[in-house]
Amino acid sequence: MSIKAKNAAHLRESAQVDSGSVQPFTRSQKIYVQGSRPDIRVPMREITLDVTPTDFGGEINAPVTVYDTSGPYTDPNVIIDVRKGLADVRSPWIDSRNDTERLPGLSSNFGQQRLSDAELTALRFAHVRNPRRAKAGANVSQMHYARQGIITAEMEYVAIRENMKLQEARAAGLLTQQHAGHSFGASIPKEITAEFVREEIARGRAIIPANINHVELEPMIIGRNFLVKINGNIGNSALGSSIEEEVAKLTWGIRWGSDTVMDLSTGKHIHETREWIIRNSPVPIGTVPIYQALEKVGGAAEDLTWELFRDTLIEQAEQGVDYFTIHAGVLLRYVPLTAKRVTGIVSRGGSIMAKWCLAHHKENFLYTHFEDICEIMKAYDVSFSLGDGLRPGSIADANDAAQFGELETLGELTKIAWKHDVQTMIEGPGHVPMQLIKENMDKQLECCDEAPFYTLGPLTTDIAPGYDHITSGIGAAMIGWFGCAMLCYVTPKEHLGLPNKDDVKTGIITYKIAAHAADLAKGHPGAQIRDNALSKARFEFRWEDQFNLGLDPDTARSYHDETLPKDSAKVAHFCSMCGPKFCSMKITQEVREYAANQRIEAVDVDVAKGLAEQAERFKQEGSQLYKKV
């Protein structure tokens, strides 16, 4: 089916939410933690646990609260209608600051053209609000407020969200132990407060991507002293995917834990696709505006102009895009440094700007007009994601002069953005072998003065097409531990094709693992609560709790049921790997019971004696390695 035919089927009167995205997780409920005002209601997911079996003490297990990116989609009390979009969360907060104005309509030329095109009526999102903009002379960025000493509702919101009811968890005994972390100089407090959030944003070490026109947003924070976040990419291309499919990818991705989503559409109807996505997104949406600008000139990079790009920025800012990837560090003098690379320039945005620079033999207009861009950003509170257009596309090219030259320029641009109180994060590689990853993180911290780092992986080897979610997940866990604030997911289809829903889920779960492993290694307060709860459930053979506490309950349950599908297996004190006779945890329980009965105090002797008895029993039963269950 052609794109045109697919989108013709996506009528605003008949669009529906993806059914798989609105199912609550088993034994989970959406809870809301209220802040200092009634309209600050911070969503979290609470997982209810079973009582410990009598054999193990019969204690009641407190519910476990986990971070929730799924928005209202998993709240059974909310009626979802993608044709109307999500409820307005932030307008009362924005109104109370009294520094914005409602425009009479779209002010970008392209936005006005699309709105007046009658042929697009069937595709267009029906409930478009008139956009907001800062009043003349005002700066509406979260960084500007933070530097004035103001704690905004958004700052309070993310502080509550980051803590995940940590005090209650400690009181319930869910954090009886947590290994000390090694944070490589990060300053992670025992509890996240709104004042700490304000300080980090004022310092430039964290950002809250929150365009004033994205009122459906549930605010989140990106910074090395907070939980490591992940981004998922969606977007159509000239080869396939409809608007409805992209909205479904959005809702599916946030169900599994995508903290932000980038719309990288390069095909037809980019403007309309983005409107549907933003109006239905509770998470920040990022874009690469140069992609759409290139479409407007028919794909000829040399025909790009500052005026066209400026109009594209305003168009997207008025829709509510929360952060822009802008490749302003690709300078004319750096392009020759890529000539001897194995893989040259692999960034789409980087290659576009390199081609423009060479065609005109002029400096990158994104660099020369950077302060003009800052004026637009602070009028809507769009955050910079300064693009790494010269990132290495192979491990052979890692950490070369082109990559690090651009990084130094991004550091210079960061200071200019901060002069305008514009929130900024820095994008990073790419393909980097493990031994060179820490150098990337250290150099970014030095060049960019601790602005949040946002990396694609990095992929640690180039030999595994089809498995690059794994090659990159390794690098992502490492750089997250070293201080990277957000990890851009990689799917199994990386380098091979556009990801489908299953690929999106696989990429997100892989990166949630990497991010959580980094949080554990950094010693983030409360990071080990979920691990401890799942380990306890595993030791007590509470199978349903094991599934439900995991990042992907569906897959865990499915794997278990492949060999032990009956309900009785959900209470069995063994799994199919070892069977009932050779389960190490069951044996440990028997050893403990024996020690208690015999009043043996020396643990080493106790374990040795117990295992010896198990060995003798094994011999008596015929020394058969495998038994029919």
Swiss-Prot record:
One Gene Ontology CC term in the entry: cytosol
Keywords: 4Fe-4S, Iron, Iron-sulfur, Lyase, Metal-binding, S-adenosyl-L-methionine, Thiamine biosynthesis, Zinc
GO annotation, biological process: thiamine biosynthetic process; thiamine diphosphate biosynthetic process
UniProt xrefs under InterPro entries: ThiC (IPR037509), ThiC-associated_dom (IPR025747), ThiC/Bza_core_dom (IPR038521), ThiC/BzaA/B (IPR002817)
Binding site residues for [4Fe-4S] cluster: C575, C578, C583
Full protein name: Phosphomethylpyrimidine synthase
UniProt EC number: 4.1.99.17
Residues that hold substrate according to the record: N233, M262, Y291, H327, S347, R348, G349, D388, G389, L390, R391, E427, Y454
Reactions it catalyzes: 5-amino-1-(5-phospho-beta-D-ribosyl)imidazole + S-adenosyl-L-methionine = 4-amino-2-methyl-5-(phosphooxymethyl)pyrimidine + CO + 5'-deoxyadenosine + formate + L-methionine + 3 H(+)
Protein task: Catalyzes the synthesis of the hydroxymethylpyrimidine phosphate (HMP-P) moiety of thiamine from aminoimidazole ribotide (AIR) in a radical S-adenosyl-L-methionine (SAM)-dependent reaction.
Cofactor note: Binds 1 [4Fe-4S] cluster per subunit. The cluster is coordinated with 3 cysteines and an exchangeable S-adenosyl-L-methionine.
Names of required cofactors: [4Fe-4S] cluster
Record GO terms (molecular function): 4 iron, 4 sulfur cluster binding; carbon-carbon lyase activity; zinc ion binding
Family statement drawn from the similarity comment of this UniProt entry: Belongs to the ThiC family.
Region (Disordered): 1-21
Pfam families found in the cross-reference section: ThiC-associated, ThiC_Rad_SAM
Domain of life assignment: Bacteria
